[in-house]
């Protein structure tokens, strides 16, 4: 398929046309969204204009699509986590590497000390993190708590590296980009939420097949998210950390060529995931096998959830997301660097 018909218009491929996990949303979505959104807004992290744009992104929808089978309490954990992610994301996007290093240190200190008051003059992300984790650990096993903190430290350090790349205008190649993107996307701590009520031992989660399935789902999430976010990111001059720009630079191709490359790469990942899911899962006995099945299905569902949210929220396509999901053609936005901390408003553009 030709994915660009002019320099100003391009086609967004549907990489999940045959993905077997359908859209599924948690029945507690509206109720938990109300509570988590009010909690996130209570910190005053953004100015009114940016807060309005942030709310339109509906990160609670992402959590409700990603955790459709979780209880109301654990869905609240997922919603709070998504909101916490994107507070850090929006601040780090416009901060110097030095400031992002400090933000990451504050977050990790708050995770390790959820009952200790934060300094009054500290960056707001510290208190957001502390409150999130203090509530989350009430419904998480000890193993899940440990894994979450380990995964979140890797995530924060990758965001620091991303800030350094941005500061130096450094464009990675595909392999090194995906290696870092697997961390910056936040999938690893997000996957731990799937385990919070499970008793899976470390040796199960460290098994090569489980690790491969986790990596494959993460890569598909990365590619899908980068496809959706590319237009907004290139418009605000923040597209160096995006697979479309990476592929264009490495292979000397245009947007059409980059989209074609991503489609083919995504298809390989999809085939590998489905083969392992259908043929490669070991058995750990009648007590653990149902948990493993639920966890791996959660990985597959996360791929669908991320893609659906990209179109159903207003983060990347404004109010036109559902229309674009159907027609797939979009106009390339004109470059305009965002001035405010917070998601870029896109409804005024001719998407």
UniProtKB/Swiss-Prot annotation:
The record marks 86 as: Plays a critical role in the stabilization of intermediate cation. GO terms for molecular function: metal ion binding; terpene synthase activity. The keyword Magnesium applies. InterPro entries: Isoprenoid_synthase_dom_sf (IPR008949), Terpene_cyclase-like_2 (IPR034686). Mg(2+) 2 binds at residue 89. Mg(2+) and Mn(2+) are more tightly associated with the active site motifs (D(D/E)XX(D/E) and NSE) and thus lead to more efficient removal of PPi. It is an enzyme of class 4 (lyase). Keywords: Calcium, Cobalt, Lyase, Magnesium, Manganese, Metal-binding, Nickel. Its EC number is 4.2.3.-, 4.2.3.135, 4.2.3.198. Its cofactor is Mg(2+); Mn(2+); Ca(2+); Ni(2+). PANTHER family: BETA-PINACENE SYNTHASE-RELATED, TERPENE SYNTHASE. Terpene cyclase that catalyzes the cyclization of farnesyl diphosphate (FPP) to delta(6)-protoilludene. In presence of Ca(2+), a significant switch from 1,11 to a dual 1,11/1,10 cyclization occurs, producing beta-elemene as the major product, with lower levels of delta(6)-protoilludene and (E)-beta-caryophyllene, and traces of beta-selinene and alpha-selinene. The 2 conserved active-site motifs D(D/E)XX(D/E) and NSE are required for coordinating the divalent metal ions that stabilize the PPi moiety of the substrate. This is Delta(6)-protoilludene synthase STEHIDRAFT_25180. The lineage of its organism: Eukaryota, Fungi, Dikarya, Basidiomycota, Agaricomycotina.
């Amino acid at each position: 398929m030709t994915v660009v018909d002019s320099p100003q218009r391009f086609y967004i491929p549907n990489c999940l046309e045959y993905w077997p996990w359908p859209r599924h949303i948690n029945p507690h979505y509206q109720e938990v969204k109300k509570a988590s959104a009010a909690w996130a807004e209570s910190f005053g992290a953004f100015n009114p204009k940016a807060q309005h744009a942030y709310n339109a992104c509906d990160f609670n929808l992402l959590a409700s699509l990603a955790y459709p089978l979780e209880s109301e309490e654990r869905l609240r954990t997922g919603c709070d986590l998504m909101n916490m992610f994107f507070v850090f994301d929006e601040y780090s996007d416009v901060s110097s590497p030095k400031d992002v290093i400090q933000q990451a240190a504050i977050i990790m200190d708050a995770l390790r000390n959820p009952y200790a008051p934060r300094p009054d003059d500290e960056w707001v992300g510290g208190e957001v993190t502390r409150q999130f984790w203090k509530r989350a650990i009430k419904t998480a096993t000890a193993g899940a708590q440990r894994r979450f903190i380990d995964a979140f430290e890797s995530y924060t350090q990758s965001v620091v590296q991303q800030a350094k790349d941005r500061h130096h205008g450094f464009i990675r190649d595909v392999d090194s980009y995906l290696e870092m993107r697997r961390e910056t996307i936040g999938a690893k701590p997000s996957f731990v939420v799937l385990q919070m009520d499970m008793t899976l031992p470390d040796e199960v989660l460290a098994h090569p097949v489980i690790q491969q399935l986790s990596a494959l789902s993460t890569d598909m999430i990365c590619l899908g998210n980068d496809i959706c976010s590319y237009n907004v990111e290139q418009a605000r001059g923040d597209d160096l950390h995006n697979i479309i720009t990476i592929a264009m630079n490495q292979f000397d191709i245009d947007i059409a060529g980059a989209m074609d490359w991503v489609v083919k790469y995504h298809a390989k990942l999809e085939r590998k995931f489905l083969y392992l899911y259908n043929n490669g899962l070991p058995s750990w006995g009648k007590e653990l096998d149902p948990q493993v099945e639920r966890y791996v299905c959660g990985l597959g569902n996360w791929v669908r959830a991320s893609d659906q949210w990209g179109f159903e929220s207003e983060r990347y396509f404004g109010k036109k997301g559902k229309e674009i999901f159907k027609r797939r053609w979009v106009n390339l936005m004109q470059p305009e660097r965002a001035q405010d901390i917070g998601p870029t408003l896109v409804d005024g553009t001719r998407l």
